[in-house]
Swiss-Prot record:
Record key words, sorted: Activator, Developmental protein, Differentiation, DNA-binding, Homeobox, Nucleus, Phosphoprotein, Transcription, Transcription regulation
Biased composition, class Polar residues, residue ranges: 19-28, 55-75
Record note on modification: Phosphorylated by serine/threonine kinases.
Keyword Metal-binding: no
Gene: Dlx2
Family: Belongs to the distal-less homeobox family.
The protein's name: Homeobox protein DLX-2
Length: 332
């Protein structure tokens, strides 16, 4: 066993000496190529020294094998002299790989320099454009949220103050139509110096305000002439019940005087005439009034059923005066 170990140590020294000699001779390729047989003999001896210790499983042998393996890696040029050993091929590959690494490292360094130069050329554009555009947005968003009693609360924007000219123009357009198309809204906003959002919000508020007043019956047409009229769908029921309801008191009057019926008709017709006089300013009211006139035109169909009652009132109160036919004419 000791003899085998001594032979291994001797072989290790010989391989180290040959590796160092071939490392110095590696810079001269022709001489290295000429020394190929010597390299082959050295590689064969190293192979024999490597294969022998693998057969014995003792610790010193494995340590010697590991040391010879690392010495071959530390001196990769020693294996480059001979191509018979597998370690020689690996040593040459590692040597060329290290050379490629050096080349790629230099190329990478130049590429990095070019990239940084290109990045610095675009740096002024990025720093001047994007942060400037983002900062006002943050400034606009920050004041909208305020912490009140430990809870975030959104602060409302200040109310838009319209001038008298803008209000008059908006009111005139609202009298024409309560809903604006997109081109009309853009044109109106541009002419008044407002944004489209402001015009849209004004029309929405105006419509909601009018609907509330219309439902509650608080439409002061005489006190507030600027108040807009009702929607077209709601205008016919206003005039139609006026004509139909005034006929009911006459039928319910029975033996009442005809002059009283005439008074009721005249008093009932005065609010409708005032409303029609005010609503006549709106173009869409004429369409509604046309439908109302159609309803009034169908009303005379009820004359045959009511004529006996009217004649009865006429004969019964003939001594009081012939006011009943006049009242019937005013109602219908």
């Amino acid at each position: 066993m000791t003899g085998v170990f001594d032979s291994l140590v001797a072989d290790m020294h010989s391989t180290q000496i040959t590796a160092s000699s071939t490392y110095h001779q590696h810079q001269q390729p022709p001489s290295g190529a000429g020394a190929g047989p010597g390299g082959n003999s050295n590689s064969s001896s190293s192979n024999s020294s490597l294969h022998k210790p693998q057969e014995s499983p003792t610790l010193p042998v494995s340590t010697a094998t590991d040391s010879s393996y690392y010495t071959n890696q530390q001196h990769p040029a020693g294996g480059g002299g001979g191509g018979a050993s597998p370690y020689a091929h690996m040593g040459s590959y590692q040597y060329h790989a290290s050379g490629l690494n050096n080349v790629s490292y230099s190329a990478k360094s130049s590429y990095d320099l070019g990239y940084t130069a290109a990045y610095t050329s675009y740096a002024p554009y990025g720093t001047s454009s994007s942060p400037v555009n983002n900062e006002p947005d943050k400034e606009d968003l920050e004041p909208e949220i305020r912490i009140v009693n430990g809870k975030p609360k959104k602060v409302r924007k200040p109310r838009t103050i319209y001038s008298s000219f803008q209000l008059a123009a908006l009111q005139r357009r609202f009298q024409k139509t309560q809903y604006l198309a997109l081109p009309e809204r853009a044109e109106l906003a541009a002419s008044l110096g407002l944004t489209q959002t402001q015009v849209k919000i004004w029309f929405q508020n105006r419509r909601s305000k009018f609907k509330k007043m219309w439902k509650s019956g608080e439409i002061p047409t005489e006190q507030h002439p600027g108040a807009s009229a009702s929607p077209p769908c709601a205008s016919p029921p206003v005039s139609a019940p006026a004509s139909w309801d005034f006929g009911a008191p006459q039928r319910m009057a029975g033996g009442g005087p005809g002059s009283g019926g005439g008074g009721a008709g005249s008093s009932g017709s005065s609010p409708s005439s005032a409303a029609s006089a005010f609503l006549g300013n709106y173009p869409w009211y004429h369409q509604a009034s046309g439908s109302a006139s159609h309803l009034q035109a169908t009303a005379p169909l009820l004359h045959p059923s009511q004529t006996p009652q009217a004649h009865h009132h006429h004969h019964h109160h003939h001594h009081a005066g012939g006011g009943a036919p006049v009242s019937a004419g005013t109602i219908f």
